[in-house]
Every structure is written in structure tokens, then in C-alpha cells.
Amino acid sequence: MKRAGTLRLLSDLSNFTGAARLRELLAGDPAILVRCSPDGRHLLLLRPPGSPAPQLLVAVRGPGLPLERAWSEGDPSPLDVFFVPWLARPALILVWESGLTEVWGVGMEPGWKLLQSTELCPDGGARVMAVAATRGRLVWCEERQPGVEDQPGQLSMAFNHCVCVKTLDTSGEAGTKLGCTHILLHHCPSFGLIASRKELFLVPTSTTWPGVAHVLLIWSPSKGKVIVAAPSLGLSHSKSLNPKQGDTWDFRTLLRGLPGFLSPREPLAVHTWAPSSQGLLLLDLKGKVSLVQCHGGTRTVGLLQEAPVGLQGSAALGTFHGTLACVLGSTLELLDMSSGRLLERKVLSTDRVHLLEPPAPGVKNEEDLETRGALRLLSALGLFCVCWEAPQGLEVPSDKDLVFEEACGYYQRRSLRGTQLTPEELRHNSMFRAPQALASILQGHLPPSALLTTLRAELRDYRSIEQLKAQLVAGDDEETGWTELAEHEVARLLRTHLTGDQLAQFNTIFQALPTAAWSATLQALQLQPDRSGRLRSQAPPDVWKKVLRAPTAGKEHPNGILPPFELLCQCLGQLEPQWLPPFVELAQQQGGPGWGAEGPSLPLYRRALSVLGEEGKRPEALELELLLGSGRPKAVLQAVRQLIKKEQWERALEAGLTLDSSSPLLRSEIFNLLLAEFAQHRRLDTHLPLLCRLCPPEVAPDELLLLLRTHLPDDAGATPFPEPGAEPGAEPPLTVGLVRALLEQTGAQGRSSGPVQSTFEDILWDSGTPPPTPPRGPMTTLQASDHPGQEAWGPSGQGLGAADVGVHS
């Protein structure tokens, strides 16, 4: 069913003070300036110069006194009047072309009173061309008289303006006070000023020099920068502009440093400018509506059915709920901002229609609860709102029904059952507590005291976050505020499933504020170093399960979005690379079976290496630490080979010695690698004691000699000294003296285990007692047989019998 845009009457203006005067002024001159206070209770009307009294009217809805001001023909009327934003009490600022500024406010006593009167241009000879108020600042563009250093001429007159800013102090019992002045831009053309809630737009006017009339500026006080944009050229450039740091710019110097901005181009043919929450709306003379975004980019929103008739016709632009509303004369057109499609076109009964800005966020307004976010129209007939209304016959589900329907889809995505979950099953099944608790809260059966006790912690966190947001909006200590907000958001995301949009937001925070994001992760995982330099964690397994969840096998990271573990490793590698290997080792201890994606997943050390760069371009020291700490045989052997290649012998030996008895094969493989190096050159001789400790206990001396023989170079000489014709600096060959320590190690291990296991054992060990000396005397038959002749070798049986007889005789 198609939704319908409706005009709903909010007030016939009878509840405003001075309703008759208010209707009279609204039905009169269409060029009247209309503004609304941030709380929506005050309406301000300023008539153009030369109009009959009163020229200024401030009407109040409900109790209160109106404000009427009139100026004689000799006294000019104010150039502009507006409410001070972000104030609990209403306050007005009146600015004249001469620079005279008055601040009016409502105190404890009824009625309006003058709080302050000051001059924006104390030197004289200057006049204010445009003025705006944004986020505690008063900004104006003033035309100055040419100085002595300025060359006379038309070009000098075109750039004799400057843009100034004055702080608005809204604290204390005295109300609003104007502070010190700072110049933002020197030698600039005439600019119009349009303020939104966050940015200030400096737009060209009909008197702007044609050569720069295609350029506009966007100043963001909270970010301390100005963006120079040329919508017709598609160019934008950012520069620092922070009054707190004393930043100021010469407009001509600023443009000369930006290539392409001074290209010949027609001035912007704009009929109407209007601020919005997304940027600045502009309507050209052909009926095309464009949006200049806060970063300087421009996009077309849509094309109106009819174009404005000249520059004199009245037009107003506004947005609500993704819809663009344009009042052109007595016609109201509604367009979809995403597609530009015309949604609805209405013909109004009057062409004296004014669009009002929506109330400030967080302001309580009982009449706007049902129409919150809707666009408001003001005419002599009353105050209306433009909103979308559901067609008749469409049944809107209750809040409790929406809770169970949303929970049904949530549980269905995570259910392992084949049957479809239904809202009725969630209502009556006691296993699903969360939707039932939320539905009970919405139903309101819990007493306020019990509900407050249940939600006290959540409300405290919510209040602190809202206070932090208000601090950021005010622009106070933004660096600390953004850091704290990032910590809150990371802690919240770690309580979710970290998939889809949550994972994308997790990546965005780490890219924008890596230090704050890692600090929040440190607290969530409860990471603490121990005395041995390792990391410990007291976080529950559910948190580690979310962090270590691997991506789906065979799929690349979409749009550069990294899984949580890869993102943490990347951040830690940039901030504190020395803690990355201990973090990966801790993650390997915390990881459990089935925590990866479907199918086999990569080991954690390889996932950490993947974010450090391609192979060959990674930091070598960090890669070695990750390989050695992985505990994987292939990774450890790869690290040992790299250490051998770099001739870091002691570290390679320590890598093998640190392995416990549960890895005998890996330790033996490392010993074989180092033994091969020991056999080929003499650069490992100084570390021979460590090599002996690394020798496996099951290696026998003959096996050791066979291994050494296998790895001996083919051109090794037979002597322990270089040949006479050998090249200088040649490696001496391996000698028995060097091998003796290894043979003694294997011999000692073999001797302590029992009987002799090798034929070389008697070479290394003697009994310490010589054999007994044979007796001296006549030689017996047995003794004669010790020196047998050829005739003495007879059959074995006969010889054995003769010897036996001789012994016992």
C-alpha cells in the first residue's frame, strides 16, 4: 500500500500571545523573516526595512509575554535576528548593518530585557553584510574600507571583506554574553552565511566577484577545519582553521594554493539556499535541487515539476524522514532524497508559507511526540506539520507483537532446528526469557521501583553516554570525548556477535581511533602482563570466542573489513608490536575446538602474519617471534632455518632447548639442522656446549658419526690443517677433537642406560684396572696353543678336549 503525505494542523495560533498580530504579519509581506526557537515555543517575525510598526515580533506559545520592537524611519531596522541555539532559556541576538549588536533574554522575572549591547565593528567605517550563529559562536561577514596597502581598483574593492567570529558565553546568571573576536578570513569577497547544527556554510551572493562566485566554504568548528568546494568543478579541499589555535587565512592566498579552483567558471545560479541535517540544499533557476554534503561533495537530489520564476519568487526547502519538501509559491512537492522520485504534489490555499526548522534534539515538546521529525509549515491559517500517514485499513502491530516478531527472526538465524519458530511459540515457551522480559517492560506491569532497580546500570551507562554526546556537540575537549566514546562503543560491540554491520563498525572505530579502541579491548579482555613477560586474561570464554571467530573458509575480507582477531593483531602491530607475539600465544591458549569457521581454518599465527604484510615484506623480528611462539613444528622449523640463514646460532639453539619433552621429534629435527651446519663450517664451534645439550638422548655414537659423515663437505681434506695451496681464510675441516665432546655426550647418555650399545664404547671408556698378568713357568698345552703353528689347527672338538685335559692335570 502506498503511504500518503498529509498536512496535520498543530495549532491555529490562538494559543500564541498576540495571535491577531501574528496572523496579520504572516498574511502580509511574503518577504518577512520567520524563525523558531530551539524549544519550539517562540516564533520570531522580522519585517523588511520600511515596513510599518512593529518591525519585530516575538510571540510565545503558552504563558509568557511577547516582544514587539519598532524603529523610526531615521533608525535602520536590524539586519538579522535569531535565537541563540542550545539554551534552556530563550535568548535573542539582534545585529544591525552598522555592527551594533543587542542580546535580549528572558530571566526569572516575566518579560524580555536587554542583557548586553556591543559593537561588532568598533573601528568604524565597516558594515556587516551577513551574520549567523552556530554552536556558541557568532559569525559575521563585514565590508571594510580599503587600507593604505591595498591598491585602488575594482578588484581591491571586491576583496575588502573579512569573516569574523565572536564567542557566545551562555553560562552564569547574566545569560548570554559576547566574548572575544577572532578573524577567520582576510581579503575575501562578500559571502552569505548559513548555519546548520554542526557546520557554517559561506556561500556566494549576487555581489560576489564573478571569478570566485563558483566557490563556497564549509567551516566545521568542532573539527577545526575549513573545506573549500567548487560544486560545478567537482573539487573540494580541506585546510586547518581553528580559532583556538590562532588559525586565520587570507582568502586569496588560500585559493592560490588550491590547483583548479580558479579555473574560469560561471557563477552558481542559485535561487534558494537551505540548511539540512545532511548538508546544504540549493535550488537553481532550472528547478534542480542539489545537496552540498559536509565533506564538500555535491549530489543531485531531484528535479521539481516547475522551476522558480526569477529570483523574486518565494521558495523554501526542508527535509524529513529521507524526504525533500519544497514549497514553491502555493505548491508543495515531496521527493524521495535517495532516488529523486516525486512522491506527492499538493496545491496549498496560500502562497504565504514558511518552513520552520525542527526543534533541537533532546528538547521536550509534548505536541511533537506523535509528529517527531516531521516538517512544520507556518502560515496565517495556523501551524501545520507534513508527515507520512499509513493508509486506512492497514493494521499497525503493537509494540509487544513487534518484539516477538523481531526476536523470532533473531533466534531463527541462530537455531539449529529445522522447524520454523513462530511468535506464539516464543510467547508460551519459557526458554526464551529475553523477549518476554522486554514485552513485560513495554506492557508496564512491573512497578516503577522494580523496573528502576533492573535497569539502573543500563540507565547509568546511557546517561553517561548522553552527557558525553552533549559535551561533543558543545565542542569541549573533543579529543578526550571521542576517545571515551570510542571506548564505550568498542565495549558495546564486544558484547554483540560482531558480524555484519557490527563488524564493519568495529573496523571503522579501529581505523579512526586505534589507541582508544585498543584501550577498550584491553579492558574487555582483561589483559595483564605477568613477571615473565607473558600476557594473562581473566575474560570469560564467550568474549574470546567472539574475538577468535575465523572468517568463512575460502572467502576474502569484503571491502577490507577484517575479522576481530586480524583487526586486533593489525592494531597491536602498529601500536605495540612487542606485545603481538605474547597476545597470539595467549589467544592460542584461549582458543577452543570448533571456534573457527566452517571447515578447517588457519592457525592463529598465520592469521596474525597475514595482516603484517606479504611474505618477504614483514618485519623479520616480529615474524620470527610469531613463528617460534606458535608451537607448530613447521613454523618453528621455518624460524630456525631463518635463524641459521642469519647465523644467529645461539638463538637457534635456544629455540630447540626451550622445547619440552613433549616435542622430541621437533627437537631432534632442529639438532639435525644444526649438526649439518657444525659439520660444514667452524662458525658454530663456540656454541658447542649448547649443541651438546640439544643432542637427543637416544642418539648413539655410531649414529652421530654417520650423521656427521653425511653432512661433511665433499672437498674436505684428510688433515686438520688447510692444504698448502688452499685459499686464505678457508674453513678448517672437522677434527676428532671437536667431535669428542659430542661423542662423550652420547657415550655418557648410552653408558648410564645399561649395557654397551656401540662398538665405539670401549674407545671412550676403559675399566681403570688392567687385565691380570699370566703366570711365569713351563708352558702348558693351553699356553702353547696361544702360539699355534699350522699343525695345531685341527678340528674344533679335538682342540677343545686337549685344552680341558691340560687344565685339570
UniProtKB/Swiss-Prot annotation:
Record field: compositional bias (Polar residues): 747-760
InterPro entries registered for this protein in UniProt: BLOC-2_complex_Hps6_subunit, HPS6_C, HPS6_N
Cell compartments where the protein resides: Microsome membrane; Cytoplasm, Cytosol; Early endosome membrane; Lysosome membrane
MF (Gene Ontology): GTP-dependent protein binding; small GTPase binding
A GO BP entry: pigmentation
Keyword Nucleotide-binding included in the entry's annotation: no
Cited Pfam families: HPS6, HPS6_C
Gene Ontology cellular component terms for the protein in this record: BLOC-2 complex; cytosol; early endosome membrane; endoplasmic reticulum; lysosomal membrane
Keyword Coiled coil included in the entry's annotation: no
Region (Disordered): 747-809
Alphabetically ordered keywords of this record: Cytoplasm, Endoplasmic reticulum, Endosome, Lysosome, Membrane, Microsome
Its job: May regulate the synthesis and function of lysosomes and of highly specialized organelles, such as melanosomes and platelet dense granules. Acts as a cargo adapter for the dynein-dynactin motor complex to mediate the transport of lysosomes from the cell periphery to the perinuclear region. Facilitates retrograde lysosomal trafficking by linking the motor complex to lysosomes, and perinuclear positioning of lysosomes is crucial for the delivery of endocytic cargos to lysosomes, for lysosome maturation and functioning.
Subunit structure: Component of the biogenesis of lysosome-related organelles complex-2 (or BLOC2) composed of HPS3, HPS5 and HPS6. Interacts with HPS5 and HPS3. Interacts with biogenesis of lysosome-related organelles complex-1 (BLOC1). Interacts with AP-3 complex. Interacts with DCTN1 and dynein intermediate chain.
Protein name: BLOC-2 complex member HPS6
Species of origin: Rattus norvegicus
Gene behind the chain: Hps6
